[in-house]
């Protein structure tokens, strides 16, 4: 990937990886330039989301970013607080986070996941106006979904290692419970992404709809 290709990806929107009735909808801050250029969520080599997802027990093996469409088969999905891609999250304005929180709330109500997991407590605080929020389960619910704030897997977040992040993600997994047996079905991203085959992994009703 050349620097020119990365720069050309600025402000690009990456479709969500979602389905109705997910066990957990993971929500990143916003797409990186690498994610926007490749179309694969958490694609930057320094991002630890995929290793942490595996080590915590959410996936039986470490998926590659290019395998993101397998996530709904495990009852998992990915979206973002802010849809547009930037080189760094600190390029975003506070109002973008607040607007993103409103869009995210509507998306969660539409899709009906059991849990919304925001991977970045600072982003969660800004998006939802909860300045005292800490890592872990939150009192807020959105529709029928409970909310958990997770540490940001970015390599810039040096306070958390893969091991300590995996422990926190595993706490969420324990709260979520075991996966059911999914049934594949076609879905379309609410952001207008192309139709893909995903799944409904639990019995909760909800309409179907990548980072």
Q: What role is predicted for each listed range?
A:
Residues 1-15, 19-20, 45, 88-101, ...:
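C-terminal capping/extension of enzyme domains
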Residues 18, 23-29:
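Short, hydrophobic/glycine-enriched beta-strand segments
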Residues 30-34, 83-86, 122-124, 153-156:
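Short, solvent-exposed loop/turn segments at secondary-structure junctions
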Residues 35-95:
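Short, surface-exposed acidic-centric catalytic microdomains
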Residues 35-38, 125-129, 159-160:
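Short glycine-/acidic-enriched loop or helix-start segments at secondary-structure transitions
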Residues 73-132:
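Internal catalytic-core helix/loop-beta-alpha segment
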């Amino acid at each position: 990937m050349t620097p020119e290709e990365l720069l050309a990806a600025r402000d690009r929107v990456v479709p969500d990886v979602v389905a109705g009735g997910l066990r957990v909808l993971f929500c990143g801050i916003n797409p990186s330039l690498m994610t926007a250029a490749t179309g694969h969520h958490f694609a930057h080599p320094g991002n630890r989301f995929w290793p942490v997802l595996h080590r915590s027990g959410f996936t039986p093996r470490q998926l590659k970013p290019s395998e993101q469409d397998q996530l709904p088969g495990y009852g998992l999905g990915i979206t973002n607080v802010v849809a547009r891609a930037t080189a760094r999250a600190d390029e975003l304005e506070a109002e973008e986070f607040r607007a993103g929180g409103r869009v995210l709330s509507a998306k969660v109500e539409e899709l009906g996941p059991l849990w919304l997991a925001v991977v970045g407590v600072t982003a969660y605080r800004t998006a939802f106006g909860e300045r005292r929020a800490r890592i872990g389960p939150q009192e807020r619910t959105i529709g029928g979904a409970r909310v958990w704030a997770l540490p940001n897997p970015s390599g810039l977040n040096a306070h958390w290692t893969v091991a300590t992040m995996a422990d926190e993600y595993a706490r969420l997994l324990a709260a979520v419970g075991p996966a059911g047996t999914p049934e594949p079905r076609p879905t379309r991203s609410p952001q207008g992404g192309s139709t893909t085959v995903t799944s409904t992994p639990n019995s909760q009703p909800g309409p179907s709809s990548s980072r």
